[in-house]
Amino acid sequence: LRLSLYFPISISLSLSLEAMASFIATTTPAMPAFASVLDPKIPTKPEPKTETPKPKDDLERFRTSEVVLERKAKGFWRRKWNPRDIQNAVTLLVLHALAAMAPFYFSWDAFWISFILLGFASGVLGITLCFHRCLTHGGFKLPKLVEYFFAYCGSLALQGDPMEWVSNHRYHHQFVDTERDVHSPTQGFWFCHIGWVLDKDLFVEKRGGRRNNVNDLKKQAFYRFLQKTYMYHQLALIALLYYVGGFPYIVWGMGFRLVFMFHSTFAINSVCHKWGGRPWNTGDLSTNNMFVALCAFGEGWHNNHHAFEQSARHGLEWWEIDVTWYVIRTLQAIGLATNVKLPTEAQKQKLKAKSA
């Protein structure tokens, strides 16, 4: 009895639904999708294409490489730390502790010799002038003895030997603001500021640990020597500072100096890819930040730098203070810096931002 009742009811119901669907499709243009659910055979008009909403954040808006942007998975602290990461973390903690002692061990000779003089030699002559604008980008040339002396000074900044530093920065420009960037902002502000220093496995993961973009430096015995003996020079400097001025020289020379230079350099990777102006259409996240420029000897004019990577001058306007450029200009005046590269007016007009 149940079966005899079921079949007539189901047949009549399906016929009723089919008739209803045909009626809706032919009489109500606004409801073809509903009709197609009732009867898939009924053709429906394709839905009009809607424009993809513009991304809200700069990370998507300034995609500059074929590499897909991906955010680093959480778990930075819970991951397995390799010995070098642990060593770097302990070193950073010790140096920050020394820097915090600086007010209690202040003396004018420690301030001027360990911080100002040694900071200028390692920070300006070493990192920004030699490592960055000369070795990485070839913005100018120096006599080999002068280049090697400045490179040695840069090694005392504890930011890596010349080959490691230059390799990281060349990769940064090659894969700027993508997951293959050594300190990509796609990984978050903390990571691109200092976290990348504590995650060496990431370099191995992304590039197999290869530094095949510094063959020009690998060919030179001096840079291979600095790479192999890098830590010995740091220990020698500590011994020299202690011999000359005791513990206050250690506090100001190995604590305050290095921490100040660390965060000045790291701010270029983090702050200057987040806050500031973009007068040039570089297609990336680089910005000009005056505060960072003052702390990092002119390196904070980072959008200028990404627009004209080989330019020896980063502060392109008269009011953009660029201490490193003033030193390069002085070296050029006395004949030590040659083949100094600057952007042409044609290059500037090509990259000038519309809003600038």
From Swiss-Prot:
**Ranges annotated as biased composition (Basic and acidic residues):** 42-58
Task: Give yes or no: UniProt keyword DNA-binding.
Answer: no
- Give cofactor(s), names only: Fe(2+)
Q: Which GO terms describe its cellular component?
A: endoplasmic reticulum membrane
Motif residue range(s): Histidine box-3: 302-306
Where does the record say this protein resides? Membrane
Question: Per its UniProt entry, what is the enzyme's top EC class, as one word?
Answer: oxidoreductase
Pathway in which the depicted protein is active? Lipid metabolism; monounsaturated fatty acid biosynthesis
Instruction: Please give the residue ranges the record annotates as the region Disordered.
Output: 38-58
Q: Which GO terms describe its molecular function?
A: oxidoreductase activity, acting on paired donors, with oxidation of a pair of donors resulting in the reduction of molecular oxygen to two molecules of water
Q: Where is this motif: Histidine box-1?
A: 132-137
List the CDD domains hit by this protein, alphabetically: Delta9-FADS-like (cd03505)
Q: What is its main location?
A: membrane
Query: PANTHER family given for it?
Result: ACYL-COA DESATURASE, LIPID DESATURASE ADS3.2, CHLOROPLASTIC-RELATED
Protein family according to the UniProt entry: Belongs to the fatty acid desaturase type 1 family.
**UniProt-recorded name of the protein:** Icosanoyl-CoA 5-desaturase
